[in-house]
Regions:
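Conserved, structured core segments of small domains
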Residues: 1-121
Length: 121
């Protein structure tokens, strides 16, 4: 089954890392990504640009509304994702718990709707 692992963390915490801390964290991410690639779990993944680069699009009463930045102000911002294959939720949670940012932020684990299968609540 496919799951998306949404990585939330405080952007300020990332911005305040020293160069050495940033290199170490990127090394941890590279190692984690290599492991899930070798295990056959990896489908895709990427770090996102900061929320200041985001554009929110909504359509209300037939009119397109475009605003800069994130829609909601929250303590943690969406900073990246992994799209993985896992046999079940337990395996997806196990993989999510190994993401380096799980130590300082939140990893949201969500199953994808399988093509041809109804969504479950």
């Amino acid at each position: 089954m496919k799951y998306i692992l949404l990585i939330y963390n405080e952007e300020k915490a990332w911005a305040n890392l020293t160069e050495a801390q940033g290199r170490q964290l990127m090394g941890e991410y590279m190692q984690f990504t290599k492991e899930i690639q070798e295990n056959g779990n990896y489908n895709a993944g990427s770090q996102l640009q900061p929320t200041a680069s985001a554009t929110a699009v909504r359509v209300r009463d037939g009119k397109r509304l475009v605003t800069d930045g994130p829609f909601a102000e929250t303590r943690e911002q969406l900073g990246g994702y992994y799209l993985i294959d896992a046999k079940d939720l337990d395996e997806a949670i196990s993989i999510a718990s190994r993401i380096p940012s799980a130590k300082t932020g939140t990893i949201e684990v969500r199953p994808l709707v399988q093509t041809g299968a109804p969504a479950t609540a």
